[in-house]
Amino acid sequence: MRLRVWTAAGACAALTACGTAPDLAQIQRQHPPSSAWLLDRHGAVMQEVRVDFRRRQGEWQALAAISPALQQAVVRFEDKRFADHGGVDLRALAHALWQNLKGEKRRGASTLTMQLAGFLQPGLASGARKGVVGKLRQMAAAWRLERRLTKPQILEAYLNLAPFRGEARGAAAASAMLFGKGASALTQDEALLLTALLPAPRALPAQLAARACRYAGQPADSAECARLRRLAQQAVQPGQAARAQADAAPHLAARLKLLPGARIRTTLDLYLQRYAAAALESQLSQLTDQDVEDGAVLVLDNASGETLAYVGSRRGAPLQQVDGVRAQRQAGSTLKPFLYALAIERQILTAASPLDDSPVAITTPAGQYVPQNYDRQFRGRVSVRTALAGSLNVPAVRSLLLTGIEPFHQRLLQLGLPLAQEAGFYGYALALGAPEVDLWSLTNPYRALANGGRVGAARLLPGPDAASKPVIAPTSAFIVADILADRTARSVTFGLENPLATRFWSAVKTGTSKD
């Protein structure tokens, strides 16, 4: 004990001052994760996003959350007298000095605490190469840490900051990168391989497996060593590293611009998010012969405006990085419900009013505008109910002639649709959805049909419900929703049996846009 105190005093004298070591909380704050996490409404992790590309630092793990196998292996093979020394293993140091004097290959004498001092102060990491003073500085820093932290805290900090492979720092990052799992789930073999990486983070698979085999105390030709070689090859070989990060909402994560270490709870539901992604994949797989490659899904809670699912694209699509929820597309027939709601509200039409579905040519300053139905057929006189449910184009244009272009344009703005042009720019094509809008702006107005005509902002994050305002008359909203749920009225275009005919009450509307 007296020798240790004297040596520490000498080291401090050489440096003029000992300084103060940080506590565990300070260490943790100084090393935030390189990722951020997006959580669903229940706290489940939906998306892990790397936002700091200077390093790969895993989320800080409490010692109890790190595999005991890894803890034991690191202590045994990196610092076997960790529990007994005060930061510097004088026996190991003396042995290393003796080997050096004899010209033999020197064994490492740095303890876990000394290595941790190097992680915290990179200038100390190469203390051995900076001569006696450099080594004394590293030893003094280790003693300061021992006085400040408990042994479990030192081990926790070490396992969270140690460089294992490449840019992966900490057991969490290394476990995820190499084995596709959390640090708590490491097996004995995986713990041995991670420990074997500590003295040689760049080791080739064969070298790594050989060291892990020696740690295991098994002969090179044993089944245990063969298993370690296979595992090392799989984990370390370029291009073979596994990834265990959550990846259910990449587009939403990109939209929210997360900061390192952030854990943001959203209004989404992970189960519904996965279900929506699977439904999109299933639907698109049936449309491959029609050259449909991608799509998006947005699910909003009608009452609260909370976003329940946000799928920006199909996984593996050529442009999967594009967020289809925010991409601009022509609205198509999805604007028709709001046109008819306006006409009904102003008592220009009722659900039973007849409209003529026959060829029409409208004179405009740009020439003749001649709308066509999707199937290029005409059905003669039809009711408003049939025209809207069957998404007929010509009756919609005739309805716009009755309401006027400017009033309908104003109604769309009131509903929150960010139209880029004035009413005259779109002309009568406004009835058929000529404006470009995104799915986020288009979906929210449909909530008004379920909320008595009231419109409020949709949201992604928990909080009080947004204030709403009346835009559509309640009776008009009810009538339009009833029409959109009318399977019989819809059959004029879609038939009685089609994907829109659900087993429960649902108001649905299709829309087609052009590329």
Predicted regions and their residues:
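Non-catalytic, structured segments within soluble enzyme domains
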Residues: 105, 109-274, 410-423, 428-433, ...
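Conserved catalytic neighborhood of penicillin-recognizing serine enzymes
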Residues: 99-126, 238, 242, 349-408, ...
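A penicillin-recognizing enzyme superfamily signal
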Residues: 19, 266-289, 297-301, 310, ...
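A short, well-structured edge-of-sheet supersecondary motif
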Residues: 35-48, 66, 290-317, 410, ...
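Short, well-structured active-site flanking segments
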Residues: 83-93, 170-172, 223, 318-321, ...
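N-terminal type II signal-anchor transmembrane helix
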Residues: 1-41, 81, 224, 228
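Short active-site loop at a secondary-structure junction
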Residues: 57-66, 290-295, 318-338, 346, ...
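Active-site SXXK
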Residues: 72-75, 79, 276, 304-305, ...
